[in-house]
Regions:
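Non-catalytic, polymerase-adjacent accessory regions of viral genome-replication enzymes
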Residues: 1-89, 477-479, 483
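Conserved nucleotidyltransferase catalytic core and NTase-mimicking acidic/glycine-rich helix/loop elements
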Residues: 19, 23, 378-432
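Core structural elements
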Residues: 55, 60, 108-110, 116-118, ...
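Amphipathic alpha-helical blocks
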Residues: 73, 83-108
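Conserved polymerase palm-domain catalytic core
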Residues: 98-113, 121, 150-316
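Short, solvent-exposed helix-loop connector elements
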Residues: 124, 232-236, 348-362, 372-385, ...
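A conserved non-catalytic segment of reverse transcriptases
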Residues: 221, 297-365, 369-371
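Extended C-terminal regions of large enzymes
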Residues: 405-476
Length: 484
């Protein structure tokens, strides 16, 4: 290992620092899940002057705007996205010339660890420098219009006009057509195990400008900086830059075509692939044969422990689960219990009693989360979940207010002000019960009802769900629910 030669400061990052590889669920929670438009591009892969189009001024300017809009942390050179516009105005032409001469060398990415959904496990992400993000974005803008039309109809991740919900709905269509057994494929450390030679070979079938393949290969081999030390990357594709999602789709399109050739029903969102079969026996056979193909032909690794065959009602896909409706046996979409727990953990975080924040600040954060969460999960049957969660969240808010009143004298006064009799106000105002227990008592519930909490700026899961229903987000909204 070589020392990177520059002192680098680190902090614990989360997926929110990293705009290119957020999950569909996280994008929705942030209210930024907007399928991107593919820029107009009339070129083909056979274009031997593709590199000139990549570094064309207009294409680079568009790439700068997109990278600035996406934000994110700085790479190893500490240049921020705010500095990009000025940098490219001054150095853009020289940079383009360096790339055209084949002399440009991408900088190593900064490797960071973020928590995975499984407790105690971490995911490695690579953060390229902001300049390299722009170049990768410029490459993606030229390649996307060429490759996207060739991708499978069963592929939904990181594609214009497609989203996770489409993949989940397609799953239920297959399930309700009799394909009720699922092969839930898990590719082990997909981005870290991509065979670079295989990737270059697949690219060369379409891209006839060898300079472009060479530039992409340099990005794959740019290396990483880990704890201030440089490490080579002779395998894998950095899970970090704007080009990574496209490269993953190009590689896994090989899997899609093989599954189509075999006549399988399947859906894929990035490296999350589900194959649906009519029987458990057929699913087991499919799992074994497709595992051999993935490892023998694509040189990727299948996680045999996590790749399972199960009934469709037992699996989790993109945060959703499936259940069989009793009245007619139809397979329906639900929010998976793990996703429910994750949502509650986030609400707890946003409504902690020990935070000295105003309700305006709390409600702003909570409302943004609720909107994003419901917008993502709105295709699920979640009317009851929304109602129950609203009641639980309101109790959380009441505990905050009860704690804010602190002294018995203040509590008695505030309760009386809200229509509680003096006798009852004294009884509750001097009670030694804890905040959570007090928040459920009839007097507190009456004094701090829905109207009061709404007046503090908080929205509800139910009202947001009804909005999603009104715009066609789900087919099973039913009548409005009363929020407790």
């Amino acid at each position: 290992m070589k020392d990177a030669g520059k002192e680098i400061t680190y902090r614990q990052l989360t997926m929110w620092d990293y705009p290119w590889m957020r999950t569909a669920e996280q994008e929705a929670e942030m209210e930024v899940y907007q399928p991107g438009r593919t820029p107009e591009n009339n070129g083909t892969g056979a274009d031997k002057r593709m590199l000139e189009r990549i570094v064309a001024r207009g294409n680079l300017e568009l790439a700068v705007r997109k990278v600035v809009r996406n934000g994110g942390s700085a790479g190893i050179d500490q240049m921020t996205v705010q500095e990009l516009k000025a940098y490219f105005e001054e150095n853009g032409e020289q940079l383009a010339e360096t790339i055209l001469k084949g002399k440009y060398r991408p900088k190593p990415v900064k490797r960071v660890e973020i928590p995975k959904e499984e407790k105690g496990k971490m995911r490695s992400l690579g953060i390229p420098t902001t300049v390299d993000r722009v170049i990768q974005q410029a490459i993606a803008q030229v390649l996307m219009p060429i490759y996207d039309p060739t991708f499978s109809e069963h592929s939904y991740g990181f594609r214009p006009g497609r989203k996770a919900q489409d993949a989940v709905i397609k799953c239920t269509e297959y399930m309700n057509s009799g394909y009720e057994y699922v092969v839930d494929m898990d590719l082990e450390k997909f981005f870290d195990t991509v065979n670079q030679s295989k990737m270059a070979e697949i690219l060369s079938r379409t891209i006839k400008d060898g300079r472009v393949i060479s530039l992409i290969h340099r990005y794959m081999q740019a290396g990483v900086v880990v704890q201030e030390h440089y490490e080579e990357t002779l395998t894998g594709v950095s899970q970090g830059g704007p080009l990574s999602p496209l490269l993953s789709n190009i590689m896994l399109n090989e899997l899609d075509k093989e599954l189509e050739k075999r006549g399988h029903r399947f859906v894929r969102y990035a490296d999350d692939c589900m194959i649906l079969c009519r029987s458990r026996k057929a699913a087991e056979r499919t799992k074994e044969s497709i595992t051999r193909y993935i490892e023998g032909k694509l040189f990727l690794k299948v996680n045999r422990e996590k790749t399972v065959v199960a009934e469709c009602t037992e699996v989790k896909y993109l945060g959703f689960g499936f259940y069989r409706r009793k009245m007619d046996g139809e397979i329906r979409i639900k929010v998976h219990p793990k996703s429910e727990r994750k949502m509650r953990d986030r609400i707890r975080e946003l409504t902690r009693r020990n935070q000295s924040r105003s309700h305006e600040e709390r409600s702003k954060e909570a409302n943004a989360y609720i909107r994003g969460w419901v917008n993502y999960y709105g295709i699920a049957d979640m009317k009851t979940l929304a109602r129950v969660t609203d009641g639980w969240m309101r109790r959380k808010i009441r505990t905050i207010i009860w704690k804010e009143w602190k002294r018995p004298k203040t509590r008695i006064r505030e309760l009386e002000k809200r229509g509680i009799s003096r006798k009852t106000a004294r009884q509750y105002g001097t009670s030694p019960k804890g905040y959570w227990r007090m928040a459920k008592t009839p007097a507190i519930h009456r004094a701090l009802g829905d109207k009061v909490i709404r007046g503090l700026g908080y929205i509800t899961f139910t009202e947001q769900f009804e909005k999603v229903c009104d715009t066609g987000g789900t087919a099973v909204c039913g009548p409005a629910c009363t929020v407790v």
